[in-house]
């Protein structure tokens, strides 16, 4: 094989955005090695510039004529582009909120950013991976980096405990997922590319076998861990409470987006012959997530634990689009994850600012905050109200789109359950808003009474302010001006071949038993 044919099969230009992230990662390490601690003033901006360049590269790859690279191991279609963009953008905002936080914790900023970029790289590769080895390596890159980030503040016992729990539960879920993947490899006759696995299973007529069912259950268990879906959510509250706040901000968006990207690609490509079965399993997960997440969040006293259970509930809402299995369903998932990126990171930015100034994340300590810090109060209020689905904020339109897609697909009772649990979530979101805004001066918490003077010119606070303002504007405006995001989500689904061919494959598979019965 000559070099030209090899280059054509590799088509490495498809992973140009990931290449830019790799170069940025190496640049961060080299600059830190040469300049040491003096580089911390601007090394975060170097990483942000690299990530923004990767997002620009993704933009120019939209509707690529040949999105397949590495002989089918990676597909840079529009679906992967939108998810890779979400992950990269979440990393940008995370770096903005991390600079002051990491410096104040006494740890090295360059190493933190390097690990974060590695996690971003893993998530971006997961979003387009179409081959078992590529999926597993990408997933492990994301997972191991996440474990390291969770325990990054080594002097904090809570961070160490969270990292250990995350590692143990994550390793178990990885083993379960890997066993399910190995069953797929065997059932398909030794295939590793996703479409070849589906064809091999259909040809061998083992789609309804016990092995295929076990593989499906194990794969869903691995995905459920990544998206924090109940009952695979046990790690979420403890990790959210103990890990550095910028880390959980990234995990709540970047890791979740990677998990849903993997779910769409893996389930629709490999399991079209048991679509009803995996939709039934995800229906159970969605019901558990929406009920457990919203009900348990009512009793939380820590803001981070409350958002942990909120994250579990949000995963349940997004699963409605996956269960619908229609173009509108997949597009609604993408749209909701886009707006979830802004409203969730806006909330975490406010929590970081409050914890940096007060040293606590207890909900009761936010009492009367409006009188001392109006901008932070506004940002957190808009974020929480949007998460609750209050119009005309972005979260309202995201939920309407999800529920409408589910209703059109006939998921009437699941949509009604989503509406009821959304009302429950509004209670604990508004409780925090009311505490910050409505309290009288004499009801102000002791922490807020001693609230330090607001000084944005301190080192690392300006990026936090920029992150807060940008996410606040996006959360407020994305709802009113949602049409461009709707169009983007719809186009990403309509232009993705696997989501269109899946309908044909599932129709053909469902017709096989009928043809056999007619022959008999």
UniProtKB/Swiss-Prot annotation:
It catalyses: a plastoquinone + NADH + (n+1) H(+)(in) = a plastoquinol + NAD(+) + n H(+)(out); a plastoquinone + NADPH + (n+1) H(+)(in) = a plastoquinol + NADP(+) + n H(+)(out). It comes from the Bacteria. It is a multi-pass membrane protein. The keyword Chaperone does not apply. One of its GO terms (molecular function) is NADH dehydrogenase (ubiquinone) activity. It is an enzyme of class 7 (translocase). GO terms for cellular component: plasma membrane-derived thylakoid membrane. This is NAD(P)H-quinone oxidoreductase subunit 2. The gene is ndhB.
